[in-house]
Amino acid sequence: MSKNIGTLWFGIGKVEEKQLDGLDFVIMIAIAKIDDETKFRKDMYKSKRKELSEIWNGDYYLDIANIVRFTPSACNTQPWFVESSEKELKVYRYRKPGKRGIMPIEMVKYYNQIDIGIFLCFIELCLNKNNIKFERTLHIEENVDNEKNLTATYKIN
């Protein structure tokens, strides 16, 4: 929350029109000015998120890890896993079988791919905020049904 503006990601939002002005519907987000600060979470660390050890392997860039673990995801599935070393971050889209929250099974892969893109954005924002120079390589998933897919590699300069 900044300046009393709140956002909510409607991961399973539905629209009447699947296309508008030649653009396909992808995702829905609500943005609103909130006049009552009590409606905001005061301590982000009290939100329901996976433990750091479930999403981050390695002892590097833990200050960044402790922020990016709060990246929003559909139904809080947090479908990512990072392997960290001094000179590299490897980001995987990780799908634990059977874990999908309330999300319909046929939508898991679709929303998890959007989630991983949002996660990459958070990583890059944190790297930039910490003045950490990097080169990103995106990887095409060969088989989206795999439990773990390499999505991006960040070479730290």
Task: Pin down the residues of each PLM region.
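Acidic, surface-exposed loops and disordered segments
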Residues: 1-157
